């Protein structure tokens, strides 16, 4: 959906990445000149939500002040939920150097909400060390009504592939459609409604440093994902009581507590720790207009930095519509072996390096130093293409989660019926063209 700046306000969004926002659902609900007055307006409670250390450098410090009907501490004790699908352990299956690809999973046959529909495919690191990521799919056909969720282990980058999501959060509401993403910060409580009845997509659970926009270097002051295109919600609250359930993900396990009111009761807030969404179709793609296919880092949307300069814990990269103008060059992504590990998904269309087998809703994994690249059909076609004319790739959106650590599949992923056992054959048809007598 393309909205003007005026329409953004009417739809309940504020523009900018990690801005210092201020919003209130009732006039005068935000205290003036202080964060924690002796008595907050409307009888609200003041509560700070911290996403970074108190002493983090100001440029990286994230926190928001919430003014809510009841404090977040009001709930019954948590008890652990026994389940085996939404995981943060990645040591149950030895990682394989084999290239792996999965067909799109089927929708559930029984009523399943967003939280119950999450299944972990792979990951590395863990929440205890606050580094690495979990990579999940979600498959849902039922809205969450009297159930709420928060993740204490990491922020969640959610990539819808089929069906819209209405993210009703403590800080406001975000409607997200395929080819948009939404990021829910660590600790923010929310529920998910399904406007289209069912939904499918991908999640990157970031255990490390918060996602940020990459530096642009010699690109200059504009390009890639522009800050103004990130949208955060305006304050919106629920004031209802009942027999509700609060689910938490904590140290790799799910926990449930009873709660007698909706925890989405924030009437006003200010700060820079907030959910946000971004339309991937707004990405300003940079590419070569002379020769060669540049490195895929030019398609970087968000990064989670590590302690090593130039090395990220997670890179979120997209491959959308774009012009290819390189002359006398092989235009698809080239054959590659990478120190990093790559998990890919396809939101819509066809990925330009794979003519067949990689379907929307599917996924692939190419781990550290595992060879990958265009399949035989793509190679032959691109090798014979007329590169004197530009070519536009249209109606596609693929993405990649790239990490420096090996991405370790879970038992579910390794044993899934959707795992394509014949994936390796897409390269077996590559012909030998070498002739030492002909250059």
From Swiss-Prot:
Under which pathway is this protein filed?
Amino-acid degradation; L-phenylalanine degradation; acetoacetate and fumarate from L-phenylalanine: step 4/6
Please give one Gene Ontology molecular function term for this protein.
iron ion binding
Residues annotated to bind homogentisate: 351, 372
Cited Pfam families: HgmA_C (PF04209), HgmA_N (PF20510)
Q: Where is the signal peptide?
A: none
CDD domains the record matches: cupin_HGO_N
Q: What class of enzyme is it?
A: oxidoreductase
What Enzyme Commission number does this protein have?
1.13.11.5
GO biological process per UniProt:
L-phenylalanine catabolic process; tyrosine catabolic process
Summarize where Fe cation binds, as residue positions. Answer: 336, 342, 372
Per its UniProt record, the required cofactor names are: Fe cation
Q: Which residues form the active site?
A: 293 (proton acceptor)
- Which reactions fall under this protein's catalytic activity? homogentisate + O2 = 4-maleylacetoacetate + H(+)
Q: Cross-referenced PANTHER family, in alphabetical order?
A: HOMOGENTISATE 1,2-DIOXYGENASE (PTHR11056:SF0)
> What family does the database annotate?
Belongs to the homogentisate dioxygenase family.
The record describes its quaternary structure and partners as: Hexamer; dimer of trimers.
The entry's function note states: Involved in the catabolism of homogentisate (2,5-dihydroxyphenylacetate or 2,5-OH-PhAc), a central intermediate in the degradation of phenylalanine and tyrosine. Catalyzes the oxidative ring cleavage of the aromatic ring of homogentisate to yield maleylacetoacetate.
Protein's name according to its UniProt entry: Homogentisate 1,2-dioxygenase
The record lists the organism as Cupriavidus necator (strain ATCC 17699 / DSM 428 / KCTC 22496 / NCIMB 10442 / H16 / Stanier 337) (Ralstonia eutropha)
The organism that produces this protein has a lineage beginning with: Bacteria, Pseudomonadati, Pseudomonadota, Betaproteobacteria, Burkholderiales
Gene encoding it? hmgA
């Amino acid at each position: 959906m393309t909205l003007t700046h005026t329409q953004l306000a009417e739809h309940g969004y504020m523009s900018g990445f990690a801005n210092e926002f201020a919003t209130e659902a009732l006039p005068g609900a935000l205290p003036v000149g202080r964060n924690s007055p002796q008595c907050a307006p409307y009888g609200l409670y003041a509560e700070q939500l911290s996403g970074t250390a108190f002493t983090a450098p100001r440029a990286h410090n994230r926190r928001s002040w919430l003014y809510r009907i009841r404090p977040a501490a009001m709930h019954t004790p948590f008890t652990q939920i026994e389940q085996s699908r939404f995981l943060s352990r990645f040591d149950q299956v030895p990682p394989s150097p084999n290239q792996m690809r999965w067909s799109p999973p089927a929708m559930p046959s029984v009523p399943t909400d967003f939280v119950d529909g999450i299944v972990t495919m792979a990951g590395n690191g863990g929440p205890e060390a606050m580094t690495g990521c979990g990579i999940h799919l979600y498959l849902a056909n039922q809205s969450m009504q009297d159930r709420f969720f928060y993740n204490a282990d990491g922020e969640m980058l959610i990539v819808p592939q089929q069906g819209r999501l209405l993210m009703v959060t403590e800080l406001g509401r975000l409607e997200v459609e395929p080819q948009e993403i939404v990021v829910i910060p660590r600790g923010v409580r929310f529920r998910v409604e399904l406007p289209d009845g069912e939904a499918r997509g991908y999640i990157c659970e970031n255990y490390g440093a918060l996602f940020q926009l990459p530096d642009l270097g010699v690109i200059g002051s504009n390009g890639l994902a522009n800050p103004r295109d990130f949208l955060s919600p305006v304050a919106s609250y629920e004031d209802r009581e009942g027999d509700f359930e609060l689910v938490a993900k904590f140290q790799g396990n799910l926990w449930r507590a009873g709660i007698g009111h909706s925890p989405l009761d924030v009437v006003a807030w200010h700060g820079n720790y907030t959910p946000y969404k971004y339309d991937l179709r707004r990405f300003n793609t940079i590419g070569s207009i002379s020769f060669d296919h540049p490195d895929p880092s030019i398609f970087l949307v968000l990064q989670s930095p590590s302690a090593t300069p130039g090395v990220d814990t997670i890179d979120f990269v997209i491959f959308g519509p774009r012009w290819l103008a390189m002359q006398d060059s092989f235009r698809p992504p080239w054959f590659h072996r990478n120190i990093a590990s790559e998990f890919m998904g396809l939101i819509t269309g066809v990925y330009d390096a794979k003519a067949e087998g990689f379907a929307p809703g599917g996924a692939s994994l190419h781990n550290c130093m595992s060879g990958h690249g265009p399949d035989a059909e793509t190679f032959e076609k691109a090798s014979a293409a007329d590169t004197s004319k530009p070519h536009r790739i249209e109606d596609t959106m693929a993405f990649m989660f790239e990490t420096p650590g090996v991405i370790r599949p879970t038992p579910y992923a390794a044993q899934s019926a959707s795992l394509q056992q014949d994936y390796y054959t897409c390269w077996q048809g590559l012909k030998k063209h070498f002739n030492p007598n002909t250059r």
